[in-house]
């Protein structure tokens, strides 16, 4: 079996895929999130290669049944198709380098490429939103070229500006709000990824796609 299922405290259960992260496995996670339907479930949280469901601790719940249900849905998901009701592709304008991308030069040197080549590699891909987490509107994206996978900073920053575009390991993403963080910051976007006044506060849903485009650069 390619998954493990384990409790998370007394109010949650997680199904985790033991295989490497892939878009195929992530689509199966999304499908489970769409199709698990039990009245006592309070929240469904798709993650990277895993899904967690939380439930009412005061409800008489058969946890063994819920565990078997998650496993059954995982097997069913192999032949099912995920339907994203949004499914949009959004172009995200980015200003690369300079004060807005203080780690661009260091990252390009680490990979022995020019800053221009780094930007080309970063903007060439169409990224898929695997899940939204860490903070409201923060998207974890699949599709970063392995040539620019970059370890997180040894010393995280205490304050990263809103809109900062970063690379952390095999991931790239955008900080929707000012926060501490350890990703390598290569640029910044003015696009608002999360706005509580919108009908749909988060700009992206799992399964959506985005492509970074160059708005400007200081190299």
Predicted regions and their residues:
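Glycine-rich active-site loops that engage anionic ligands at enzyme catalytic sites
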Residues: 1-219
